[in-house]
C-alpha cells in the first residue's frame, strides 16, 4: 500500500481460498482518506508479460502534480521458466493524475533479478529521489543466495542504479524496509535464505525460519546518505543528502 497525498493506493495482490489456491489481481484500489471513498480502477499495463507479483512499489511525491508510483522486480505469475524473474533494467511508473502506466529504462549497476526484497525511498535536498532495494532471493535457498545480501539505490530522475559497497554475508527475504528519519531506513525481519539443510522440497523452506537473526532484535538501520549500515538509530538526524556516488552521477552529466 502506498500513500498518494490524501489517497492510499493498493496495486495488484492476491485473493485466496481455504484450499490454498490464489488468483492474482490486476486492478488498482485507491482509498481517499479525506472523503472515505474506495475506488477500484482497471488500468492497462505497459507490457505483455502478464501479472507480476512479489516485487516492490514506492510512492515518489516530488515528481508530477500528484506524485508517481514506481514499481519494480518480482516475478511473473503463472510462469515456471528460468526467466520468470523480472529484470531491473526497466521499472514501471504510474501517473495517478492521468491514470497511466509507463515503462522506464534504467542504467548503472543493476541488481540481480529477485523477489521478496524490501523497498523504501526518500527525497533528497538536491531534488532527487532515491529508492533502496535490499535483499530478496531468486527462489533458491543455500549458499548460492549469499550475493542477494546486497543493497542497491535507484536515483530519480536519472533512473541510475548504484550498489552499496559491503561484503554480503546474511541473505534474507520476506522482510520490510521503512524510512524512519531523513536518511535512515529501518530493516525489519525476514527469513534466512542461506539455510537449506533438507533435501525435501517442502521441508527446505521450513529451515529458513529456524536460525537466529544476526540483526539484533531482527532490526537494522541502513543510511542512505552514506550507503552503509549504521550501528544505531539517530533520533535527531540531519536532512537527507544523496550519497557522493549519486551526486557525482548528476554532476558529470
Regions inferred by a protein language model and the residue ranges of each:
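Juxtamembrane/interface segments of multi-pass membrane proteins
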Residues: 47-48, 79-84, 103, 107-110, ...
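Conserved short beta-strand element of beta-propeller blades
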Residues: 1-10, 18-31, 41-76, 85, ...
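A structural motif specific to WD40 beta-propellers
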Residues: 39-41, 102-104, 162-164, 230
Amino acid at each position: 500500500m502506498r500513500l498518494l497525498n490524501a489517497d492510499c493506493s493498493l496495486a495488484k495482490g492476491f485473493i485466496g481460498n481455504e484450499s490454498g489456491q490464489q488468483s492474482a489481481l490486476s486492478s488498482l484500489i485507491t482509498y481517499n482518506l479525506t472523503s472515505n471513498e474506495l475506488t477500484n480502477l482497471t488500468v492497462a499495463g505497459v507490457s505483455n508479460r502478464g501479472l507480476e507479483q512479489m516485487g516492490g512499489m514506492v510512492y515518489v511525491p516530488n515528481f508530477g502534480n500528484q506524485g508517481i508510483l514506481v514499481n519494480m522486480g518480482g516475478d511473473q505469475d503463472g510462469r515456471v521458466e528460468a526467466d520468470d524473474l523480472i529484470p531491473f533494467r526497466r521499472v514501471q511508473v504510474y501517473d495517478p493524475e492521468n491514470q497511466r502506466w509507463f515503462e522506464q529504462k534504467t542504467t548503472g549497476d543493476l541488481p540481480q533479478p529477485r523477489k521478496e526484497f524490501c523497498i523504501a525511498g526518500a527525497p533528497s535536498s538536491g531534488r532527487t529521489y532515491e529508492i533502496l532495494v535490499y535483499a530478496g532471493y531468486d527462489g533458491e535457498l543455500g549458499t548460492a543466495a549469499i550475493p542477494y545480501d546486497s543493497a542497491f539505490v535507484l536515483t530519480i530522475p536519472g533512473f541510475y542504479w548504484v550498489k552499496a559497497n559491503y561484503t554480503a554475508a546474511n541473505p534474507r527475504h520476506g522482510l520490510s524496509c521503512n524510512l524512519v528519519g531523513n536518511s535512515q531506513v529501518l530493516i525489519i525481519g525476514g527469513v534466512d535464505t542461506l539455510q537449506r539443510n533438507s533435501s525435501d522440497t517442502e521441508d527446505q523452506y521450513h529451515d529458513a525460519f529456524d536460525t537466529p537473526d544476526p540483526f539484533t532484535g531482527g532490526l537494522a538501520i541502513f543510511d542512505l546518505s552514506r550507503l552503509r549500515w549504521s550501528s544505531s538509530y539517530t533520533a535527531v538526524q540531519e536532512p537527507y543528502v544523496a550519497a557522493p556516488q549519486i551526486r557525482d552521477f548528476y554532476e558529470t552529466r
